[in-house]
């Protein structure tokens, strides 16, 4: 929307980064920008955005993503986009398997995704779960969002425990703060209340989240060093 008002992609990103840096100065946090290509947009528009964002990789931008309607726009149609990202050393995650298709997860892995957004569809695909575990591909779980989009029918059928026991690196996320009206604490507590998440799991999930993040090594080390006192 902002580009339609005359702003350049780099200007938009730099403005967002200014806000994030202001938050970092006030709060004890680290931030990074994940730019997101959209499935419903044409290849030229998405690729142009990635090329502009790549100029700011390491200066606010940490990686890229692909989101949108998986059924209407399957991941197989975005090979060129992620070949470019891979060749230009731009880390990426791909929303995959939020709907019922495991094929989009498989394709994302073939493209070289370091993380999978949601991945719910592989809950009944043990070979795919094993592949994610073996390749240490992080899966971004978003319980509230998955309930709202009906990726699952109830929290009782959420595959957190199944993924955990399969050895898949996972992070617990909000997906979005405002649309779902949730926080990371709320998401953890939803799993606790469902009897899925135990305190003993905390360090493993925390460390898996940190390892799968696109933060640079210095940030990861700084956050890691604080674990014993948190």
Go through each PLM region and give its residues.
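Mid-to-C-terminal alpha-helical segments outside catalytic/metal-binding sites
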Residues: 196-230
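Active-site loop-helix segments enriched in His/Asp/Glu that coordinate
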Residues: 1-35, 39-44
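Short, acidic/polar
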Residues: 42-53, 99-106
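Short acidic/histidine-rich active-site segments
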Residues: 93-99, 168-183
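Flexible glycine/proline-rich, aromatic-decorated loop/lid segments
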Residues: 155-165, 179-181, 187
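Charged helix-capping and loop-helix junction motifs
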Residues: 10-14, 47-51, 76-83, 153-162
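Acidic (Asp/Glu)-rich catalytic clusters
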Residues: 17-28, 51-59, 82-86, 128-134
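Active-site core of metal-dependent hydrolases
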Residues: 62-151
């Amino acid at each position: 929307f902002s580009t339609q008002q005359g702003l350049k992609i780099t200007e938009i990103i730099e403005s967002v980064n200014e806000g994030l840096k202001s938050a970092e100065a006030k709060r004890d946090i680290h931030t990074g920008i994940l730019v997101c290509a959209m499935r419903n947009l044409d290849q030229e528009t998405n690729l142009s955005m990635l090329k502009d964002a790549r100029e700011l990789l390491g200066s606010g931008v940490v990686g890229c993503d692909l989101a949108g309607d998986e059924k209407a726009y399957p991941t197989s149609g975005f090979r060129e986009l992620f070949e470019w990202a891979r060749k230009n050393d731009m880390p990426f995650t791909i929303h995959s398997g939020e709907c019922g298709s495991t094929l989009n997860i498989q394709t994302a892995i073939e493209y070289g995704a370091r993380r999978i957004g949601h991945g719910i569809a592989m809950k009944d695909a043990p070979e795919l779960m094993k592949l994610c575990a073996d390749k240490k591909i992080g899966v971004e779980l978003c319980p509230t969002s998955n309930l709202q989009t009906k990726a699952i029918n109830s929290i009782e059928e959420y595959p957190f425990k199944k993924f955990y026991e399969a050895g898949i690196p996972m992070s617990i996320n909000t997906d979005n703060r405002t649309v779902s009206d949730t926080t990371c604490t709320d998401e953890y507590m939803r799993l606790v209340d469902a009897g899925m998440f135990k305190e003993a799991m905390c360090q493993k999930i925390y460390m898996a989240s940190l390892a799968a993040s696109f933060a640079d090594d210095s940030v990861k080390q700084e956050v890691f060093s604080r674990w014993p006192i948190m």
